[in-house]
Amino acid sequence: MWTAPVLLWVLGSVWFWDSAQGGAIGALEDDLVTPGPGDDMVNPGLEDRIETTDTTGELDKSTAKAPLVPTQPPIEELPTSGTSDHDHKEHESTTTVKAVTSHSTDKKTTHPNRDNAGGETQTTDKKDGLAVVTLVGIIIGVLLAIGFIGGIIIVVMRKISGRFSP
């Protein structure tokens, strides 16, 4: 009956499965560290065709290219008339990384299943629930699309074989 066409359709789509697995991934962009304008480093000898030497007056022997030369600090780092030199040095030496979190950093949070004696509350991230709903919606949509396409294929096969009666 309809099992032979469906079996042929499944076997014919096997070659798609290998490409759906994905290929080998090389080095990710996040793992690469390259000096750039943000690092205050330039290589003027490459673009200008000017031979650049290091502090000893010789070319870099390992690459036979001009070494990276630090430039002046960007204009954002230069002190302005409104700030003192002391404030600038303090800002320059202090690096603070602020991360966006879903939990308050000022209050202690407790486990949601334990007694909450201090009256502290725990905040949760509403975006986690949104991600789960989105994932479930995508899965349901893909399953419905597969069923819809399968139904169209079955109707077309029946029409071709002459067993279609509306």
Curated annotation (Swiss-Prot):
Stretches for region Disordered = 54-124
Organism phylogeny: Eukaryota, Metazoa, Chordata, Craniata, Vertebrata
Task: Give a brief account of the tissues where this protein occurs.
Answer: In adult kidney, expressed on the urinary surface and foot processes of podocytes and in parietal epithelial cells of Bowman's capsule where it is localized to luminal surfaces. In lung, expressed exclusively on luminal surfaces of type I alveolar epithelial cells and pleural mesothelial cells. Not expressed in type II alveolar cells. In bone, expressed in osteocytes and osteoblasts. In spleen, liver, stomach and intestine, expressed in mesoepithelium. Also expressed in thymic epithelial cells, choroid plexus and leptomeninges.
Report the Pfam families cross-referenced here. Answer: Podoplanin (PF05808)
Region labeled Requires for interaction with MSN and EZR — which residues?
A: 158-159
Glycosylated residue positions = 34, 52, 55-56, 62-63, 71, 80-81, 83-84, 94-96, 101, 105, 109-110
> Where does this protein reside within or beyond the cell?
Membrane; Cell projection, Lamellipodium membrane; Cell projection, Filopodium membrane; Cell projection, Microvillus membrane
Q: What is this protein called?
A: Podoplanin
Organism per entry: Rattus norvegicus
An additional note in the Swiss-Prot or TrEMBL entry is:
Down-regulated in puromycin aminonucleoside nephrosis (PAN).
Keyword tags? Cell junction, Cell membrane, Cell projection, Cell shape, Developmental protein, Glycoprotein, Membrane, Sialic acid, Signal, Transmembrane, Transmembrane helix
Q: Which residues form the signal peptide?
A: 1-22
Q: Which family does it belong to?
A: Belongs to the podoplanin family.
| PTM (free text) | Extensively O-glycosylated. Contains sialic acid residues. O-glycosylation is necessary for platelet aggregation activity. Disialylated at Thr-52; sialic acid is critical for platelet-aggregating activity and for CLEC1B interaction. The N-terminus is blocked.
